[in-house]
Amino acid sequence: LKTFRWTIFFLVLVSASLQAQDRPLLDISIKAFDANLPESSLDQQQSGIYPAVRQAEVRYLPSFLKLMLEESGQWGAVRLLPDLDTGAELQLSATIVSSDGSTLELAIRAIDASGRIWTDKIYTGTAVESVSLNEPVLGTDPFLYLYTAITGDLLMVYQSLTSQDLQGIKDIATLRYGAALAPDVFSPYLNQDESGLYQLTRFPADNDPFLMRIREIREHEYVFIDVVDEQYEDFFVSIKPVYDVWRRYRREMLASEADKVRLEQEQGSDFRRGSYMSLRESYNNYRWSRLQDQYLDEINAGFINEVLPTDITLEDSLFHLSGTLDEQYKEWRGILKELYMLDNPQTP
């Protein structure tokens, strides 16, 4: 806890230092986390993984990280997406290594548009019940220290870059987005070396018609991203109360199991069927089973918005998107690419 307080103090100092500087702010694109879910139900059971909870964490955990980054005030727009963002200035992705309510392990990778890796490691946190910071949402998460470590690492890299570096990242992101739609037009502006890093060969003029159209198409994509973001936010708000309780009871269950093992070792044959401790253990298991069924039902109910269709108006046309958010996002990007090609039939 002492280390946690010093980390918070350090971030406050870094934040104050950065606010005093006139530097370009990078937008962050966060991909919904990889569930890392074993294929067989037996493997899931042996690993103590509940599929409904893990699928909820795929959305919940990045939503909390997004909130942390936004609250720091040191970034541009922070967006949570169902897939990787081809035009991301700073792309963040993660795999849930383990999550049992008591400990949380996330394999985090952050890479900017130039190919520079900001962080690529596993962050591990142990639940801290007493975390508060007088924050109604941020301060109630038992793994706040883990998220603070992630945001702190990102801020350290950001602070190490010059304004020219940051603007270069933003320009490369724009051109990489353009190259995904019209490679023949925008790829010549970029050079990728053997290590995978991108450099600008030159940047098109601001009044370049292709660049202007790409920027317009990008804004159209943000329209759908705003819809996705709203759905993720609704999911986060609706699932947080039951997820918090579920994690707390998971910690209690794990502690109870540890106590049982300890008592069995201490008491040996005295810990027998029909004894008070054995009966209490049976009751706790029954109680946990009933509570778990209730919580899993509520968590499953939180996915209702995941498959709701989306209607979006674009340039006097109405588009109806259906399927999961991931499927809708891919469909929308396909529509935007077709729109670009229709507007630029002579694209080389």
Residue ranges and their predicted role:
Residues 93-133:
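Amphipathic beta-strand/beta-sheet edge segments enriched in Tyr/Trp
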Residues 7-15:
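Bacterial N-terminal signal peptides
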Residues 21-23, 127-348:
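C-terminal/domain-edge helix-coil "capping" segments
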Residues 30-70:
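An acidic helix/loop motif centered on a single conserved Asp/Glu
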Residues 1-7:
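Bacterial N-terminal signal peptides that target proteins for export
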Residues 26-39, 168-175:
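Short hydrophobic beta-strand segments
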Residues 28, 77-108:
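A short, hydrophobic beta-strand-centered structural micro-motif
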Residues 16-20:
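Sec/Tat signal peptide C-region and signal peptidase I cleavage site
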